Each structure stands twice: as structure tokens, then as C-alpha cells.
Amino acid sequence: MIYPTSFDVIVVGGGHAGTEAALAAARMGCATLLLTHNIETLGQMSCNPSIGGIGKGHLVKEVDALGGAMALATDIGGIQFRTLNASKGPAVRATRAQADRILYKAAIREMLENQPNLTLFQQPVDDLLIEGDRVVGAITAIGITFRAKTVVLTAGTFLSGKIHVGLENYTGGRAGDQAASTLGERLRELNLPVGRLKTGTPPRIDGRSVDFSVMEEQPGDTPEPVFSYRGKRAMHPKQLPCWITHTNERTHDIIRSGFDRSPMFTGVIEGVGPRYCPSIEDKINRFADKDSHQVFLEPEGLTTHEFYPNGISTSLPFDIQLAAVRSIRGMENAHILRPGYAIEYDYFDPRGLKASLETKAIQGLFFAGQINGTTGYEEAAAQGLLAGLNAGLFAREQEAWCPRRDEAYLGVLVDDLITKGVSEPYRMFTSRAEFRLQLREDNADLRLTEMGRKLGVVGDEQWDAFCRKRDAVEAEKARLQATWLHPSKLADPAALARVLGKPIEREYTLQDLLKRPNVPYRELMTVPEAADGAPELADEVAEQVEIQVKYQGYINRQNEELARRDNLEDIRLPGDIDYGLVKGLSKEVQQKLNQQRPETLGQASRIQGITPAAVALLMVHLRRGFTDAKTA
């Protein structure tokens, strides 16, 4: 049957990408349908019970700045919060939280059910409805046809998913869930560039069978960081510690004894796994000289005894898993609640996508998450929000949007995917960004919330709070720049000397004094003349003022570097350009450009094998008027 209501946007899949996509499209006012194989698993954390980390926390903050759900759900469900790299510069500081799986999933479910313009429906999707070169709907397993202007596909590991434990394997999207095999076969028929990747998860442990007294306790930070710009510390539930132990030589010997039954080493698994989250057997094989590896026991929640042993992801046979776990200090009597496993699944070459995450081959079809070759909840959520937002814009026949590399880690993520592709699951690191001094966690809202408001994904309450913060930061910076301290006019010169480490000998602005190393804003405000006329600032405002003042010189230099670049990002390449007509390009370069069809000269310049000389030839070609290149 054809469902009686048509939609602007259909989102297929209810994981981290799908939920953000559906919420974003609905926030814009688009009639949105979220199709999931099981409403009970919306927002489920399929692997580790944590959100954030280096690079990943930056993405979560950006999703939050654009009105997304992940950071807020983490504040509601987070049972341990830490700031990583706290002693380093603000560019690489990152928030990480352990989450109670049940609380996190419940928070996401509540947001979905209470979001205007969003309809939920439980049915697996077996096919896409395509007319010509455009998607116009989705067809479920029981034959219901839903029509829509756009479809966002966020299938995670479900497309032709196969689960491996030792040499035993079976089809599945994750443990306990069926794979989307029919949809996987249908997508392969569309001649989209497809490959196989794999990921894995460790065995889960019953905490009652663990001796924590011989392990190192790892508490969260006090006071606890708050993840969301809309979050409050009062939202946080009871906090729990993690625990650290280590593998040993006996563990490694046990694991090596199972290599002959490992699906990874026997060639049973075709897919490539994540480089930065390797299985324990892969670590022992690659780093044979190491006699131990860290294992973090992470609590799964407040109402369960289940623990996630981060660091021992495995697809080895269960007898090897059990023996290896019980060889680890503190886990000699451990009871495994769920076996570890690997899962391999289909992904599609992201070089077949536009920057909006719309497929180049099929109009109105957007991909987000692991289907694009990424790994991680955070990377999925960021793509989901962008795809949902752009699906909404497409449905309204408006121009697509994607941040640039110098504007957001989301821009770095998308640009890396669509220009370089992936040969292994892609995860975000701060080192991937050239302009990371500007792309900090603390200023994600200042970078993106104004654009989010224009696009319709940021609500009134968030916008009002953002405006108050932005205005308070600017007002205090102006006061610091306009306020002068003269040594002869200080009531207590020693007070300022204690803050600065030495007395001043001439007149300085407060801005000049705050620029000095080891002079915190709050300490400077203990000097009466500095605090005169100062407003009472919230911590996040004071932090932003201090960072902007201290790093403005470095940021200015980075901005100059940006300005010196040729405006390659603004020069669009027509979709119908024939690179075979560009004089001077090698056959290899012509082939790569014709295959990948970059949207801008900037994208073209980052394709592997495209030289600066080739970019110069393209610019000459465009300037001669062979094609009509429009400035973005």
C-alpha cells in the first residue's frame, strides 16, 4: 500500500546519525518520517558507553551548537565527565563522558517523541523508491510505500552485516538485531561504489565477578564539565569511577594460541577494521614487543552490574575470550555476560557524495554515518545533522550548506571524506584540522550557532542564551581594551604584582596584561582597579574572554594565512565540465577529476595526485571562458 501521507524528508535508521538527521529536518519545519526496525533501540549505544574525546568532543559541541541532541542527552545520562588534555592549550582540550546506556537512550527517545513535525514508524526498509535519477520514497519489509521529496539513509553496520565470533559467523546488524540484507542487495544494484569495512566490540563483564581492589580507580573531574551549551551540572545523575588494569604475557600467549581460529587472520573477514581502535589480537600481533596493554573497565549504567572492558575488542572464539579475560589482574573470576564479536558491513565510497552528503548519482538521496566509511557515534551524529539539514533544504529547493575546513571539524570531516575517500574506518582527531586553534570546543557556538539559526535548526531558547553570551564576551573584551592601569594610580601596587609576578613600570590596558602567560582572568579581577566596573561573568563567558584575548595574535596570523590562500573554495566547478578538454592535464589527473567530480577548486586541490600545477591549469581553463564557473 501507499501510505496516505507524504513527507518532505524520510530518515532510514534510528542510530546516532538517524536521530540527529530526523531532529534537524523536523526542527526546520519539514514534515519528517523516521523509519526504524525497532523503536526500542532508538539512540542505542551499540558499542562503548561513552561520548566525546579528542576530536570527537569537538564534533559533539558543534552538533550541539547547531541545536543537536547528543551533548544534551549526554548531560542527562552521563555518569562520569572528564576534560582530556586539560593541562594543554584550549585547541586540544576535549570533553569525554561515560554514559548510562538506558538514561542516554531514554533522553534521545523523549526528544524524538516530543519533536514537532516528526513521525516515528517501526518497520525495516527493504527498498528505495526511485524515479529516473531521483529518490521519491522508501518501501518497507511488509510492502508499505512512503513517499517523500528526500531520503536520508543512516544504516550503520546493518547493510549486509555479518557477525563473527571465531570461525562461526551469521548475518546481523549488531548482536540481537537482523541485518538489512535486502536493502544492502538493492543498493548494490544501483551501481554505487561499495566496499566492506569491519568493526568490533569486547566481551561485557559482570562487575560482581571483578576484584576492583587490585585495579587503579579513575574518577571523573570535580567539578564536572558540562557537555551541552544548554546543559547544567544539576542534570547529571550519580557519578561513577572507571577502573584500569592491564593485559600480561599470559594473556598474550592465550590470544596468540587462538590466531589459527581468528576470522581476521584466517581471511574469513574481508573488511578493514579501524586503525585507531584495533582488536586486542591485532594489537598483540602488530605490537609484539609490548608485554601489556591497558584495559579500562567502564560502567554501563547505574542500574546494571555490566562493565565494558575498553581495550580488548575481539572476534576470537569464545573459549579464547574467556581464558584471556580471566588471565587479567582483577578478572580472574570474571563472568562474561555477552561475547565479543566483529561485524563487517557494506559502506559506500564517500567520494560519490556532494559536500551536502547528497549522492551524486541519485538526486535527493543522502548518506550519513558508517555507510560513508566513518566510525564512532560522534562522527555519525555530525554527519546525520548535516544530512538532515540539507535534506530539508533540498525539499524546500534551497541551496545546500556545509561548513568549510576553517569553520568546523564537521567541515574537515566531510571534506576529508568526499575528496580523499576511506581505506579504513575514519575517525576524527584534532590533528586532521589545519586551523585547529580556531576550531576549539569552547567556541563551537560562536562559530556555528548564528548559521544554525539562519538555517532554522536552532530554537528560540538556545538562540537567546547564545546572544547573551556573545554580547557579554564582546562587552567585556571592549572594557578590557578601554581600561588602563597606571602604576602611580594603583591603591595597592603589590596586589597587581602578585598576579603578574612583578610590578608594572608603565601604563597598560587590562587586555595587554591578560595577554601575558600565567595571568588568568579571574586572578586579574582580584585587583580592585581591574574589577572596577566589571560585570559578574559566568564561567563560560570569562573563559571565552580569556582565550580570545590570549590567543588573538596567533589567530590573526592563522587568518592571514587563510587570506593568502587563493580563493579556491569559492570557485565552483560546473557539474558538466569535461576535464579531457583542459589543456596540459595528464591523463591520470583527467581520469581522477572525471571520476570524483569535485564541486570546487578547493576540493579538487585536495584529491590525492592533483598537483598545484594541475590546479593552476584548471584556473586558466576557467578564466578563458571554456565553461561558466560561478563564484559560490
UniProtKB/Swiss-Prot annotation:
GO cellular component: cytosol
Physiological role: NAD-binding protein involved in the addition of a carboxymethylaminomethyl (cmnm) group at the wobble position (U34) of certain tRNAs, forming tRNA-cmnm(5)s(2)U34.
The gene coding this protein: mnmG
Molecular functions (GO terms): flavin adenine dinucleotide binding
Subcellular location, record wording: Cytoplasm
Superkingdom of the organism of origin: Bacteria
Quaternary assembly: Homodimer. Heterotetramer of two MnmE and two MnmG subunits.
The keyword NAD is annotated on this UniProt entry: yes
Zinc-finger is among the record's keywords: no
Protein name: tRNA uridine 5-carboxymethylaminomethyl modification enzyme MnmG
Protein family: Belongs to the MnmG family.
